[in-house]
């Protein structure tokens, strides 16, 4: 008879969790940041608020964003005028959009990841789906299982209302699933659509206006498993460790509340300061076991909450400008897509590294860090090990 200990040992994988494929997707509707203030104030019937419009223009100019993708078109917004007001009851209209579009966008990203992975989708054993865009039962995990035609026995986990740190959270969870279930192949999907947060401007809620200048739509998907099959599965990054922490004195720094008016967004001015003040402690705890203390020796994947956060982190840690290149490129081309951002940055980094012949998936470097920041204020820290290209 097999003992519990022997059975448990047989369940565990031998090697570390490994990213084996990445896919991304956006809606087709592309928004030019330079013309967005005019469009936004026109579609929300707010053109008379000239001073506020000037403030919004400055926010968009400072955002370092060139373009974003949004499911919400002018046509959709005209059909749902309550979404264009500042605080009109509109949750039903928003929910009707996101319960369909969030899994649909997730499917696009997942199909790309599965295609790159090159294995039959029947080999997917676990599904982790994450979104801050609406809630429903059965959830997006169920909808995606149906849309992709995954096995009914796939083990699902649905994460709602996590916010911008969740790209790190899903990697942490997928790491544990892959390493503790021999042969597991975990499909991770983060899909975000701003239909829940879009609303008209108001003088008394400027942090909401910041969100209107930064947020975009996108979905990222990755396949994670341990012990890749040689010659069949191609590793991209290894997940070495993962940690989550709440920053001290940060209560109320980033909040979101689901109301009749949709998801309201609240942001304190000191968020960049709170993150930059505490980030080195997270780095030290993560990299001390590896004997690494030179932050410029790492490749960087940081959630691009906004340019102020990136600037302050760069200054605080003395990072060379090129360290946050991949992060800034994604912010510029897509905006802040909440949980999906870090998956886009992983994709950007491995593609740029291969194109430039840098030797590893991590810009030619061996070790890297992935950071997620969000409500709480919560920080996710994932230590990555690159793979030779």
Swiss-Prot record:
Function of the protein: The primary product of this enzyme is 4,2',4',6'-tetrahydroxychalcone (also termed naringenin-chalcone or chalcone) which can under specific conditions spontaneously isomerize into naringenin.
Tissue occurrence: Major expressed member of the gene family in various floral tissues and in seedlings treated with UV light. It is relatively low expressed in tissue culture material.
Sorted UniProt keywords: Acyltransferase, Flavonoid biosynthesis, Transferase
Domain of life: Eukaryota
Catalytic activity: (E)-4-coumaroyl-CoA + 3 malonyl-CoA + 3 H(+) = 2',4,4',6'-tetrahydroxychalcone + 3 CO2 + 4 CoA
Name by which UniProt lists this protein: Chalcone synthase A
Gene Ontology molecular-function annotations: naringenin-chalcone synthase activity
Pathway: Secondary metabolite biosynthesis; flavonoid biosynthesis
Keyword Transferase part of the UniProt annotation: yes
Enzyme class: transferase
EC number: 2.3.1.74
Pfam families: Chal_sti_synt_C, Chal_sti_synt_N
Family statement: Belongs to the thiolase-like superfamily. Chalcone/stilbene synthases family.
GO biological process: one example: polyketide biosynthetic process
Active-site residue list: 164
Organism per entry: Petunia hybrida (Petunia)
Statement: the UniProt record of this protein carries the keyword Acyltransferase: yes
């Amino acid at each position: 008879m097999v003992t519990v200990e022997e059975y448990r040992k047989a369940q565990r994988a031998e090697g570390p969790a490994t990213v084996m494929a990445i896919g991304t997707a956006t809606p087709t509707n592309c928004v030019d940041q330079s013309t967005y203030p005019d469009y936004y104030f026109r579609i929300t019937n707010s053109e008379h608020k000239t001073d506020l419009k000037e403030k919004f223009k400055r926010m968009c100019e400072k955002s370092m964003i060139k373009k974003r993708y949004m499911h919400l078109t002018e046509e959709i917004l005209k059909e749902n005028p309550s979404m264009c007001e500042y605080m009109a009851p509109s949750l039903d209209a928003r929910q009707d959009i996101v319960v369909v579009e969030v899994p649909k966008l997730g499917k696009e990203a997942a199909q790309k990841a599965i295609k790159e992975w090159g294995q039959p989708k029947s080999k997917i054993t676990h599904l982790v789906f994450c979104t801050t865009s609406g809630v429903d039962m059965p959830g997006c995990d169920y909808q995606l299982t149906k849309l992709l035609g995954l096995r009914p026995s796939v083990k699902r986990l649905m994460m709602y209302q996590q916010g911008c740190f969740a790209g790190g959270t899903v990697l942490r969870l997928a790491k544990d699933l892959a390493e503790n279930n021999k042969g597991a192949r975990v499909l991770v999907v983060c899909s975000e659509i701003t239909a829940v947060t879009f609303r008209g401007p108001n003088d008394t809620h400027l942090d909401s206006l910041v969100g209107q200048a930064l947020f975009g739509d996108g979905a990222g998907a990755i396949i994670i498993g341990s012990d890749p099959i040689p010659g069949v599965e191609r590793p991209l990054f290894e997940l070495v460790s993962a940690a989550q922490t709440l920053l001290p004195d940060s209560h109320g720094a980033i909040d979101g509340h689901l109301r009749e008016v949709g998801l309201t967004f609240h942001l304190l001015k000191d968020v960049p300061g709170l993150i930059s003040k505490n980030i080195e402690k997270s780095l030290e705890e993560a990299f001390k076991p590896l004997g690494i203390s030179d932050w410029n020796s790492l490749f960087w994947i940081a959630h691009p909450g906004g340019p102020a956060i990136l600037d302050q982190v760069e200054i605080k840690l003395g990072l060379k400008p090129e360290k946050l290149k991949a992060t800034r490129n994604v912010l510029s081309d897509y905006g802040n897509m909440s949980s999906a951002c870090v998956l886009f940055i992983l994709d950007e980094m491995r593609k740029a590294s291969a194109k430039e012949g840098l030797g590893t998936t991590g810009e030619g470097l061996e070790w890297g860090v992935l950071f997620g920041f969000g409500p709480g204020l919560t920080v996710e820290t994932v230590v990555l090990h690159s793979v030779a290209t």
